[in-house]
Amino acid sequence: MQLFHLCLIISCTCPTFQASKLCLGWLWGMDIDPYKEFGATVELLSFLPSDFFPSVRDLXDTASALYREALESPEHCSPHHTALRQAILCWGKLMTLATWVGNNLEDPASRDLVVNYVNTNMGLKIRQLLWFHISCLTFGRETVLEYLVSFGVWIRTPPAYRPPNAPILSTLPETTVVRRRDRGRSPRRRTPSPRRRRSQSPRRRRSQSRESQC
């Protein structure tokens, strides 16, 4: 909490620091869950190890390459686009704060404490947030939630009773589609519909009657 109060004092004296209170409160460990409205939780994201998430720069470049037009548009495209835009903006403001702290704090220990905290703890939260919304836009929210649950079950299962490799997000849509197709087609192949039987019998009778007339 001393670090939190220190950064609040610094942010009040820094004219360029405009990050939202919601983003700041969540990043500093307050009781705010940014995933709740999207059907996920912070705990669900925490099952993924820290080295699973790419760097903030790589995630920001991916978001810009895939969704630049929607992110730069003043219109509201979707909740995921808006959350992604705010996360990128928040990280930029935090980098401005870290730079300002590094240039203005006289105490080297306090300066290093703030800068390291921003780059490690807060950086991980931003990486998780960016990955979640980019994945939801790319693969669909239901697929991402299914992946998080599958990975959570896999990581909590003892190694002797689980597959050697963790689930892969990009393979979940194919598996889901195959399951739906198999379930939908199998009853049709086994038994024909009764309506077809009834519709075929009058046609056969008519054809037989025509042959007898000829």
From Swiss-Prot:
What ranges does the record give for the region 3 X 8 AA repeats of S-P-R-R-R-R-S-Q, renumbered to this chain? 186-208
Task: Note the Pfam families from the entry.
Answer: Hep_core_N, Hepatitis_core
A single Gene Ontology CC term: extracellular region
Which residue spans adopt a coiled-coil conformation according to this UniProt entry? none
InterPro entries associated with the record: Hepatitis_B_virus_capsid_N, Hepatitis_core, Viral_capsid_core_dom_sf_HBV
List residue spans for each sequence repeat: 186-192, 193-200, 201-208
Q: Where is the composition biased (Basic residues)?
A: 178-207
Which Gene Ontology terms describe the biological processes this protein takes part in?
Answer: microtubule-dependent intracellular transport of viral material towards nucleus; symbiont entry into host cell; viral penetration into host nucleus
Highest taxon listed in the record's lineage: Viruses
Which residues does the propeptide include? 186-214
The GO molecular function terms of this record are: DNA binding; RNA binding; structural molecule activity
- UniProtKB keywords: Disulfide bond, Host nucleus, Host-virus interaction, Repeat, Secreted, Signal, Viral immunoevasion
Region annotation Disordered: residue ranges? 165-214
Q: Positions of the site: Cleavage?
A: 185-186
Signal peptide per UniProt: 1-19
Which family does the record assign? Belongs to the orthohepadnavirus precore antigen family.
| Purpose | May regulate immune response to the intracellular capsid in acting as a T-cell tolerogen, by having an immunoregulatory effect which prevents destruction of infected cells by cytotoxic T-cells. This immune regulation may predispose to chronicity during perinatal infections and prevent severe liver injury during adult infections.
Q: What is this protein called?
A: External core antigen
Originating species = Hepatitis B virus genotype A1 subtype adw (isolate Philippines/pFDW294/1988)
